[in-house]
Amino acid sequence: MSFTRQDEVRPDDQYYWVTQNSDGSYTGIPKELEDREESDKDGNPMYVKIQGEVDGKPAMVDSTERLVTKGLKSQWIAKVKHNTNMTLAQTDWYVIRKVERSVDIPADVATYRAAVVAWATATEASITAVTTVEELKLINLGVSI
């Protein structure tokens, strides 16, 4: 008699808090989709710490800005913005040339840039609309024009 080991697929750490169980299986708890304002164990709001003074000595003190943990939606929208900026950067010189020297942007470049922006807008709307991690996993974050 022989045994064939079958390893369970580990849940994607981008979307889940993953722990390995003693039997080799994994437990994946979905990460938060929405941003969360943090509170201490007593339910009091937490604030971003800044360098300040206490009794005339340097110390970390609370600012007026609430401490917020970014959810997956905010993180993914930031990725879309980054990918879009990197894609548009390749043709930004056309825009600069237009502003600085009044040289028209070629139609195909303008069309491409508009398509990239439209893709980003639609993708951000799709991310905003998701209600589960499973829905979020289906969204392509690469610029696809």
Which residues fall in each region the model found?
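A preference for well-ordered globular domain cores
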Residues: 1-145
